[in-house]
Amino acid sequence: MGKALIVYAGRSGETKRIADLIAEGIRIQGSEASVVNITKVKKVEDLEGFDAYVFGSATYHGEMMQGMKTMLFLAEKTGLEGKVGGSFGAFGWSGEAPGRIFDTMQNIFKMDMVNGPLMLKSALLGGGVEMAQGYGKDIAKKF
């Protein structure tokens, strides 16, 4: 049984809701998942010891949240090459953050990424619950 770390950055609670649903999908597949607010990640050691990493941020003014940018610099020092990865985010008008996180994880960290980033306006709209849980299941199938 593998372990996944899901780190999220958001203000309204929507990004956390998506993170929790992704974790449910991972657990349905029989793996462990820890959901952590970005404010709890302060050092490289906070990111070590997992088989999969899923990073998510809300998009504000076309950008990921500053806490996620800072955490990605820490993650770069963690040695994530070859680890399973995914990205997600909630947005109101535009959804650039999940794609930028995904590109960083794939091209800089050289991670084994799942299909693509998960971008939802809300976990509760348009099948969002199923999409987020399905994303978690897809991640769990890779490790």
Report the location of each language-model feature:
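FMN-binding flavodoxin-like domain, especially the glycine-rich phosphate-binding loop
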Residues: 2-4, 14-17, 21-35, 48-143
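Short acidic active-site motifs
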Residues: 41-46
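Cofactor-binding loop segments of dinucleotide-utilizing enzymes, especially the Rossmann-like FAD-
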Residues: 9, 38, 90
